[in-house]
Amino acid sequence: MSFNYSMNTPSPSMLSFDMDIPITAFLHNSDVFQLFHPDIMEQVVVNKERVFFPTPSFNVLNLESDCLYKMSLRFDKTNNKRFQFNRQTKQWTEYDKVSNHKESEVFVHPSEIRTGDDWMKSPVEFFIKVTNLRSSESDEVICLESQCKYQPTLLIQKVFRDCFGCFQAHGPPVEIKFALLTFIATTRYCSRRIADIKSSLNPFSSQDTKKKNKRNTLKAVSQEENQPIENSSFHQSFSNQYLSKPDLDLKSTTLLQIAPDHSFEPTNFVSSSHFPCWDSIFCQQSFPTPSSSPYSDSLPHFTNEWNTPTFYNENFMSYPNFPNY
């Protein structure tokens, strides 16, 4: 036994199969689905799985507290006709092409079997993934045919445990249909009004995602301008230990003059490719460590105005303890 409730009846009710206890179900978020009225709601179905949105949520009342129930949502085709969108009237109309006959898809709630008291404590939400790929055999994904109209039906099945511990159905399920949930499956939104409503309701819509990605990109560029050194292990450690001025860039043709207190002063010089010793720093190779003396005479240093190399010596400055990589 089932009833098909019109849009003028937002709170449908239904008698159970034994006609003793009236089982009542309400569309908890009926105000959300009412936004699409009088147009027919559209749901995009493509090869990639997409979440059915908005998420239908139901309040179920008058279940027997100690009895076991199973909730599911069935997707029935309203007919075997396909629909096309008229750009002039902005309405969906039937045309002669007949859709492929297929049994209705049923999505079982992940909670599966619970007591009536548990089902009535809070709204029952159905997070469903839909696709038009027929090869998908997952129980968590519903396959729908594009350009077809569907009517979701809430199924409330009373079950019991037999002597073998298996669950068996106790009579036929209670079926409740909501006209507000009727939709047409399509590969893309045809009605601009429907698309705008869904975009305003969905915080993860493509428009909001693009704006957010643009803000993140501008923020990342701003951070890169304030942090010229590359985010590598060598440069990060090198800057943290030895650089006292954050505006120096290892990529520029500037040599770091080592002072006795291990601070650095930039000095212009000719291209670093003339000196493999300094290229080893920029290429992140191991920096040579003196074996016998803490001072080195092998490091080129440019201090005069002709940019000719001079060398560190014991009387000039100490050699810092560079880390080994």
From Swiss-Prot:
Q: Where is the composition biased (Polar residues)?
A: 219-236
Q: Where is this region: Disordered?
A: 204-236
Q: Which CDD domains match?
A: T-box
**Is the Iron-sulfur keyword given for this protein?**
no
Q: Which organism is it from?
A: Caenorhabditis elegans
Please give one Pfam family short name.
T-box
Q: Where in the cell is it found?
A: Nucleus
Question: What is this protein's name?
Answer: T-box transcription factor tbx-35
Gene3D superfamilies found in the cross-reference section: Transcription factor, T-box (2.60.40.820)
Question: Which sections of the sequence are annotated for DNA binding?
Answer: 32-210
Q: Its function?
A: Transcription factor which plays a role in mesoderm development, probably by regulating expression of target genes, such as homeobox protein ceh-51. Binds to DNA consensus motif 5'-[AG]T[GC][GT]CACC[TC][AGCT][AGCT][CT][CT]-3' in promoter elements.
Tell me the null mutant phenotype. Knockout causes abnormal development of the pharynx, when cultured at the restrictive temperature of 23 degrees Celsius, which is exacerbated on a ceh-51 mutant background. Embryonic arrest occurs on a ceh-51 mutant background. Expression of homeodomain protein ceh-51 in embryo is reduced; abolished by simultaneous RNAi-mediated knockdown of pop-1.
Question: Does this entry carry the keyword ATP-binding?
Answer: no
Q: Which InterPro entries match?
A: p53-like_TF_DNA-bd_sf (IPR008967), T-box_DNA-bd (IPR046360), T-box_sf (IPR036960), TF_T-box (IPR001699), TF_T-box_CS (IPR018186)
Recall the GO molecular function terms of this protein's record.
DNA-binding transcription factor activity, RNA polymerase II-specific; RNA polymerase II cis-regulatory region sequence-specific DNA binding; sequence-specific DNA binding
